[in-house]
């Protein structure tokens, strides 16, 4: 299937109507359309706006916004809000929380603090997705759905009690007996033999910090499977309600996920979150001679390997940083154009800039969008308009598929194993 529009390359942006006064909505959409932005992604962090209390659903807020979007002629990608469970949920059901390897729960206050394997959380996620898809799936302006947001970003290891229980079930299904598990894990070494399934856990703190490497590999396979099951659960629900031609995607790429499996079972195509100036992150060492932001071609190549047609859900448009640190500088003049064309050259049919307005509050207060805090026109907005003119001239390549001259085999088992079985950085 084509992404969004098989006749041309499409530009978009990420918009958060819940962050802004409703009086700005029409103005914002009008300004977007004027510079060539035709699609917005919304709602991926807005669980409370739809379900302010358990089982209590209120559609008024996004009904009003979608009315404005339809009136303006703006197309919309709806995000399922499961990346940020509300406070009422985690307070009532702490078993939904993820934990560190020492068992300490990750509490409410940031995002991605849940685990995939809590039966309660899966049920509550299924409920919110069912209600959202059932209510908004038929809207004419809604053209697609994003599952969750950045699955396995921030946290890609899970150590809650729910994960231990699910890990045991995963191993029982895989091996069938403790005898076969012990053999596969070489458990006779250092007297690690298991005699009861209740003795088997996800990795836990040890004297030296190391864990049985065979156990660890199975554990990372289990995380990948758990992530895919979570995505598949949401996709199966959404497909019951979407219109013909609407799509389901999610945004990546992050660790401990077999994206090829996800593309085959859950989503229509993958989208990538592209922040090339992470190459200049002062928190991470990088060699002075490396390719910096130009090495992003490798990431785009991996994205294309997941689905031959793909999109960019978040393309860097400003400086990036949380309230606790700055991670990437503002794009120089022309860099947004360079990165957009780089993505399109690799096969992207859709490029969406993060975000429209820079937020004036919250953890991402320093994560700049197209517009700065003032909301006034600036050079980045003008550059988006220039990009639109360029991509309009490239309309004949929309839907085209990239032909690679060289292929690289990627094996998830080897990647997972190499995280722990390594001798140098």
PLM region descriptions:
Residues 1-24, 29-38, 285:
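An acidic-aromatic substrate-binding cleft motif
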Residues 200, 204, 232, 244, ...:
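Carbohydrate-binding surfaces of carbohydrate-active enzymes
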């Amino acid at each position: 299937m084509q992404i969004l529009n098989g006749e041309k390359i499409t530009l978009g942006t990420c918009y958060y109507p819940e962050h802004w006064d409703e009086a700005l909505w029409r103005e914002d959409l009008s300004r977007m359309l004027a510079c060539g932005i035709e699609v917005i992604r919304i709602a991926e962090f807005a669980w409370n706006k739809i379900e302010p209390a358990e089982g209590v659903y209120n559609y008024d807020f996004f009904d009003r916004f979608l009315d404005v979007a339809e009136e303006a002629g703006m197309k919309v990608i709806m995000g399922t809000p499961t990346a940020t469970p509300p406070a009422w949920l985690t307070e009532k059901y702490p078993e939904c929380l993820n934990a560190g390897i020492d068992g300490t729960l990750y509490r409410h206050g940031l995002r991605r603090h849940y685990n995939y394997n809590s039966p309660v959380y899966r049920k509550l996620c299924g409920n919110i997705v069912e209600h959202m898809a059932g209510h908004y799936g038929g809207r004419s302006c809604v053209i697609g759905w994003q599952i969750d947001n950045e699955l396995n970003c921030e946290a890609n290891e899970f150590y809650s009690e729910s994960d231990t229980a699910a890990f045991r079930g995963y191993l029982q299904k895989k091996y069938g007996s403790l005898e076969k598990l012990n053999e596969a894990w070489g458990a006779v070494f250092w007297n690690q033999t298991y005699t009861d399934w209740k003795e088997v856990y996800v990795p836990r703190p040890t004297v030296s910090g190391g864990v049985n490497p065979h156990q660890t590999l199975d554990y990372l396979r289990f995380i990948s499977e758990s992530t895919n099951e979570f995505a598949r659960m949401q996709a199966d629900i959404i497909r019951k309600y979407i219109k013909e031609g609407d799509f389901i995607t999610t945004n990546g790429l992050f660790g401990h996920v077999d994206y090829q499996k996800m593309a085959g079972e859950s989503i229509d195509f993958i989208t990538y979150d592209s922040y090339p100036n992470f190459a200049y992150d002062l928190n991470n060492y990088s060699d002075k001679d490396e390719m910096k932001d130009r090495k992003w071609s490798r990431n785009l190549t991996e994205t294309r390997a997941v689905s031959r047609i793909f999109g960019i859900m978040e393309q860097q448009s400003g400086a990036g940083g949380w309230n606790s640190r700055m991670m990437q500088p503002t794009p120089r003049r022309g860099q947004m154009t360079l990165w957009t064309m780089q993505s399109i050259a690799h096969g992207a049919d859709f490029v969406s800039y993060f975000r429209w307005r820079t937020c004036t509050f919250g953890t991402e207060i320093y994560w700049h969008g197209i517009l700065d805090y003032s909301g006034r026109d600036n050079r980045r907005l003008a550059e988006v308009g220039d990009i639109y003119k360029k991509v309009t001239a490239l309309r004949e390549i929309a839907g085209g598929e990239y032909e690679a001259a060289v292929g690289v085999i990627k094996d998830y088992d080897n990647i997972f194993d190499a995280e722990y079985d390594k001798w140098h950085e």
